[in-house]
Amino acid sequence: MAPEHAHYNGSKKIRSLREDKLASGAKARSRYGEACFQRGRVIKEARGQHTALRAGKDYETNLRRKREFRVPLELEPGRLRVQETTPSLDSAGTDDQDSENAESDGDLPIEVICDLEVIPQDVDEQELQRLRRENDRSSSPAGANEGIDDEEAGEEKVSFPSPQHSKHSHGPTGSEQEHFQRVSCVRHSYMQKLKLPQPLLAEELLERTLKYFPLVEKILSGQHPSMYYDHARSAFKRSRRAVLSIDEFRRLDLSLFTAGYYGVRRQMRVAVEVLHHYRDLIARQNNRVLRWWGVSDFAQYVLAPELLSALCQEEMNLPTLEDAWDVMEATTEFGLLVADDGPLEEWEVPAHLARLEAAGHSSNLREDPSNDKR
């Protein structure tokens, strides 16, 4: 073969190899470009799904915030649109999201666009005030609230008091006079039949009850009898639940768990002191009755009235604790109506005496339990 032909064939092979390399590189670049394009499309779709999900979750929050910032609403036939005065929460994000928000032109992310019907109302505030004044003048005491709901009637009384209500604003109402009359009758009746001691104020009550606090440990260990624990155990046995529910509590006869003539307020005050000293001890107990009631309720409805029963035995010089239980069961009405109505703290005494005087019971102040200074 001639040298020139050999050189020509060699050059041809080199060009073929170069073209093959260029073709393979082009194919690789093509595959790489296609892969980048696919990846970009996947990322864009993921961003779109994330934006739609976030818009769905934050729609209510965005709408509420737009209302709070008083964003003006523009109503068009069949669509609800917003005039963008401030950047919304959905507008923050990437450039793709910004472009999508720009194309939406302020449309709220509502999946179903409903037709809205706007009924304009022209209400003058002065006209409303004039109508209210006319209604007040024309209303009679017998039918002042006819055709008005209870809630609206209450607002009307507060905003526009009638002369009939303001006439007796500085004196006791008839219902308050009847209440004090009933309290006086109940107090006088129990004092005559049982000669009950006058209810103690909180400071002296705790001072005299403190010496009976060791009974808490004895009651928890079963070494001391307790009428209130027997009642609590009976309620537990009637239940099918692991703990005392609200419905079961409402069905309980709470008169069985009330500390007689001491009343509920003093009973709760003693229970707070019991929890202050014995909460950890009570919580460590494995007693099923106690766990069904719970620590706080067990202290209030079992331990506190039991300690006050011991104090009752001392105050009334009763021979046995059973006698004190009988007194506690028989004087529940006195405790709820008389003792709970009177003052518990020292600073409540002047206000209570002022109420009695305003109700016309100043002559009975010496008989009032709260007036005893001890």
From Swiss-Prot:
The keyword Nucleus applies. Belongs to the RTC4 family. InterPro entries: RTC4, RTC4_C. May be involved in a process influencing telomere capping. This is Restriction of telomere capping protein 4. Keywords: Cytoplasm, Nucleus. Residues 1-31, 75-106, 129-180 are annotated as: Disordered. It comes from the Eukaryota. Its main location: cytoplasm. Residues 93-106 have a biased composition (Acidic residues). GO terms for cellular component: cytoplasm; nucleus. The keyword Cytoplasm applies. It holds the Pfam family RTC4. It is found in: Cytoplasm; Nucleus.
